[in-house]
A protein has these predicted regions:
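Walker A (P-loop) phosphate-binding motif
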Residues: 1-34, 39, 109-111
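Aromatic/hydrophobic pocket-lining residues that form π-stacking "cages" and hydrophobic walls in ligand
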Residues: 15, 77, 157
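Active-site catalytic microenvironments for nucleophilic, acid-base chemistry
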Residues: 18-22, 80, 198-205
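ATP-dependent carboxylate-amine ligase catalytic core
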Residues: 21-105, 123, 129, 151
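Nucleotide phosphate-binding/pyrophosphate-handling subdomain across enzymes
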Residues: 88-93, 100-111, 115-116, 129, ...
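Internal gly/pro-rich beta-alpha loop/helix module
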Residues: 108-109, 121-200
Length: 240
């Protein structure tokens, strides 16, 4: 589960790509979508087929007709991943952590990307309020990983980790392959380092293959449409 304010989608994408580079079948759930809701649910980088969407949607609606939009999509994604028999599910949280739909599922690791001011009307007016809510995504005995945080936010994470008996691992100084990244911007190294930290732990726990050169290829292959994406000029239109 990927929780935070900035870089959740990028970190989720990096983790998915690194796992796929090592031969795993990966389900990736992100939000919001850019063009179509189908983008939110991907299996090995491919959107859920259009003909499967209504079939699975009907099953979710029949089982739980009163879900919110995000809860519905979360349930649909989990159902799609279960049917596909994926090896790893990467779930990006939608809003906060305490009551987010992705927190309802059991997880093997929780990642915290940089936490900042967002959704103040729902999560609270201060960074402490926001970080406290997001920190509640931690589960007892489940390791948590965090990117560098503002002091206020880190204090909240450390306090919740102690209360829940969770080991919180700070990733700023952990080993990281020196490779090109598929996502643009110097800030992406923070997200990639977090993804590598949780991948190293998961690979060790499951005895998955884990080679630095393969991880580097995975990081370089990352692509997230609409996020600092460069589109070349075509049909008389300028590049974007």
């Amino acid at each position: 589960q990927i929780v935070g304010t900035n870089g959740k989608g990028s970190t989720s994408t990096f983790l998915s790509c690194v796992a796929r580079a090592h031969g795993l079948k990966v389900g990736l759930y992100t939000s919001p979508h850019f063009v179509t809701p189908r983008e939110r649910i991907r299996i090995n980088g491919t959107m859920l087929p259009a003909d499967r969407w209504p079939v699975l949607a009907d099953r979710v609606m029949e089982a739980a007709p009163n879900l919110t939009y995000f809860e519905f999509l979360t349930a649909l994604g989990l159902l799609a991943f279960a049917e596909a028999g994926v090896d790893l599910v990467v779930m990006e949280a939608g809003l906060g952590g305490h009551y987010d739909a992705t927190t309802a599922m059991p997880v093997q690791a929780v990642c915290f990307t940089p936490i900042g001011m967002d959704h103040e009307k729902i999560l609270g007016p201060t960074l402490t309020d926001i970080a406290s809510d997001k920190s509640q995504a931690m589960r007892p005995g489940v390791p948590a990983f965090t990117a560098p945080q503002e002091a206020e936010a880190l204090d909240c994470l450390l306090r919740t980790a102690q209360e829940k008996g969770t080991e919180l691992r700070e990733t700023a100084t952990l080993p990281f392959p020196q490779s090109a990244l598929g996502l643009a911007g110097p800030h992406q190294r923070v997200n990639a380092r977090l993804a590598i930290a949780v991948w190293d732990w998961l690979a060790d726990q499951h005895h998955w293959p884990n080679m630095p050169e393969t991880a580097a290829k995975g990081l370089a292959s990352a692509h997230f449409p609409g996020r600092f994406q460069r589109i070349p000029a075509c049909n008389g239109l300028p590049p974007l």
